[in-house]
Amino acid sequence: TKVDLTVEKGSDAKTLVLNIKYTRPGDTLAEVELRQHGSEEWEPMTKKGNLWEVKSAKPLTGPMNFRFLSKGGMKNVFDEVIPTAFTVGKTYTPEYN
């Protein structure tokens, strides 16, 4: 499984819009959740077309962690993928542990 997360236009201090390339033959993403640095809580991201979005009342705190659930039942957690000072247009590729 290969995963790339590209920060898209519309992202700012309180909003994160991602184009997620999830490459696993015969499988697609069903759910994506984000956990901010220092938080215990996973926040669901909303799918809009091919993009995933989360809006926060307060500025997002990185490095941000992600949890994926695929339609085929695969679960993946990626820690410290996107920093607080992310760059729109940049692709972040998580490390597999």
From Swiss-Prot:
Keyword Secreted on entry: yes
Primary residence: secreted
Keywords: Allergen, Secreted
Domain Expansin-like CBD: start-end pairs: 14-94
Compartments in which it is found: Secreted
GO cellular component terms listed in the entry, alphabetical order: extracellular region
PROSITE patterns per record: EXPANSIN_CBD
Top-level division of the source organism's lineage: Eukaryota
GO biological-process terms attached to the record: plant-type cell wall loosening
InterPro entries from the UniProt entry: Allergen_Lolp2 (IPR005453), Expansin_CBD (IPR007117), Expansin_CBD_sf (IPR036749)
Similarity annotation: Belongs to the expansin family. Expansin B subfamily.
Protein name in UniProt: Pollen allergen Lol p 3
